[in-house]
Structure formats: structure tokens, C-alpha cells
């Protein structure tokens, strides 16, 4: 199993349009996408070999809307790119880590993703992502 790589850092925002600070810092939005199953509109900004993912809720009941309501805008998760998401999930579950998703679900860029509970990541929500070839 290859070592995971940092894919992106997810940042919850009320509005993608209001998050202009990143463009002022010289970053460019490379890709936007709505992931209806997760109730979120995303914008990816390239930062070297990684990305920032801005997450805007598409409705008041989305996970991101609830996160912003409870904690305000800010860092939501870190995402690690893996080559075999099922193997990683099976190993983590066998080791007793708490998973939000025991099986991958569709994510942005056509990737398969799964989240580990923040209790498993020292208070940090960790997303695993596998690119579909």
C-alpha cells in the first residue's frame, strides 16, 4: 500500500463569492462543482502539489451548513489521497478507529471518498479520497 499524500484542506464558507481572500493571495479557482449528494458546492484552488477546497452549503440541512452554524466558517477537514480506499477503511476499522463512512461514497472530481470520525483523528475530520481512473 502506497503512502497517502495530502490532497487538500477543506474550508467551510458561507459563500464561495465571499471567499475572495484566496484570490487576493494569488490563488486561482481551478474547478468548481456541486456535489448534490453531500449538499455542497465546491471550489478547488491549487497550492503547489495540493489544493484548498472551499465548501459552500447548498441548503440549510447540509452537513456544511450545520458545521458553519455550530462552529462558524473555517477549516473543516484534511483529505489524504490513497490508492486503495477499501483496504485503508478495512484496516482502520479492524484497528478500532471510528468511521463515518464504512464504504466509499461519491465525492468531488469523480473520486470515491470516506470520512473518519474526528475522534479518530485527534479532533480533526479526516477524509480519504481515491481517484477513479
Where are these regions (language model features)?
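Conserved secondary-structure micro-motifs at functional edges
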Residues: 54, 58-62
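Vicinal oxygen chelate
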Residues: 2, 13-21, 25-27, 34, 43-48, 52-53, 59, 70-119, ...
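Short, flexible, solvent-exposed loop/turn segments with mixed acidic/basic and small polar residues
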Residues: 1, 65-71
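A short local loop/turn or secondary-structure capping micro-motif enriched for an aromatic residue
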Residues: 61-64, 133
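Short connector loops at helix/strand junctions that flank enzyme active sites
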Residues: 40, 47-49, 70-75
